[in-house]
A protein has these predicted regions:
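Structural/interface elements that position substrates and couple domains in central-metabolism enzymes
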Residues: 34-336
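Short, low-complexity, charge-dense intrinsically disordered segments
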Residues: 1-12, 18-35
Length: 336
């Protein structure tokens, strides 16, 4: 038996998971009986929570080869998807809806969709809250709560934009539920993170021709400040998480048109940081060329000539260098 040491304290009437100092000892058999038998790859069923640019593009991509159920709370969007009318502006989604035989259905009933899913892709909105100075992640946790209620064996993959460290923090948050709730006894918390790198109105295209695929799974991090998270991952994480990450990456590769896609597997926190710093750099690049354009205007210079001269340096390049009103969209302002 492998033994996980967990410390639980009552703080202000609530039980808190506080670390690895024992008084509670949970034993898990080493033959891994808590793993569930996922369907064969070709028969995998997938649910996608959210039908914005991220969710609908992923649902469309995966439904080329698998049964996919898209979940949303807006009846009009669900109706449009089922009639193969895209509720968002995206040329390739519209094209695939019109021309492809997609195994895609949409529903308002998340409970039913998640109950029979092998993978649940979470693409719920995470709007930035200026009052709390933080991402509003409650929609993600609402989905997780429902999945754990109806199908705790499902592998959940967060695709939403989230702060660095968020996915690991969920292992700590949900540790007590898995250790104490009878209905979760013997189950494991199957949660991954896979950042998206999509452009609005080109979301499906960017999934068909991805620059890279990254999937993060739970890994240990050295340092005493990570003891609680590490203990939670040891207690409720699944040793098969890396294999599930590889399966999810294979799903994305299967749906893509591009061959030989660079695919990376790393810790969840590192995967979150990739998304953050990629978007921060893109926002910085837009701001840089806008500042250059402003300087040129004040000094009476030809901005395009300067930009062309700079861009011919291969370390800088000629892409993403058009001065404009600034950067926007759903992700760049949140990440920068």
């Amino acid at each position: 038996y492998r033994i996980a040491f967990v410390s639980i304290r009552e703080i202000r009437g609530q039980y808190k998971f506080v670390g690895i100092i024992p008084p509670l000892i949970i034993k898990f058999p080493t033959n891994n009986p808590y793993s569930f038998h996922m369907r064969a790859f070709k028969d995998l069923k997938i649910a996608v929570a959210g039908t914005g640019y991220v969710g609908l593009s992923i649902a469309t991509l995966l439904s080329q080869h698998h049964d996919v159920t898209a979940v949303d709370v807006i009846p009009e969007k669900v109706d449009k998807i089922n009639r193969r009318v895209s509720p968002i502006q995206d040329e390739y989604i519209e094209k695939y809806f019109a021309e492809k035989e997609l195994r895609l259905t949409a529903t308002l009933d998340g409970r039913a969709a998640y109950r029979d899913a092998d993978f649940v892709v979470i693409a719920a909105p995470t709007n930035y809250d200026p009052v709390k100075n933080f991402f509003d992640t409650h929609h993600i946790e609402d989905v997780i709560d429902l999945v754990l209620e109806v199908n705790p064996d499902a592998v959940m993959v967060i695709k939403s934009t989230i702060p660095v460290g968020y996915t690991r923090s969920l292992y700590k948050k949900y540790a007590l539920q898995f250790l104490l709730k009878p209905e979760l006894k013997g189950k494991r918390f199957n949660l991954l993170f896979s950042p998206e790198f999509l452009r609005e109105s080109k979301a499906l295209y960017d999934n068909l021709y991805p620059s890279r695929i990254i999937v993060g799974y739970p890994k240990m991090i050295e340092g005493t400040e990570f003891d609680e998270e590490n203990a939670a991952i040891k207690a409720i994480g699944n040793p098969e998480a890396e294999a599930y990450a590889e399966t999810f990456a294979r799903l994305l590769q299967e749906g893509a048109i591009k061959d030989d896609i660079s695919t990376l597997f790393m810790g969840m926190k590192e995967a979150e940081a990739v998304k953050l710093f990629a978007n921060t750099y893109l926002a910085l690049r837009v701001s840089y060329f806008n500042e250059l354009d402003t300087y040129a205007e004040v000094k009476g210079l030809d901005a395009q000539a300067i930009i062309e001269g700079i861009g011919l340096d291969p370390r800088i390049g000629t892409h993403y260098n058009n001065p404009s009103f600034g950067y926007g969209g759903y992700c760049l302002p949140k990440d920068s």
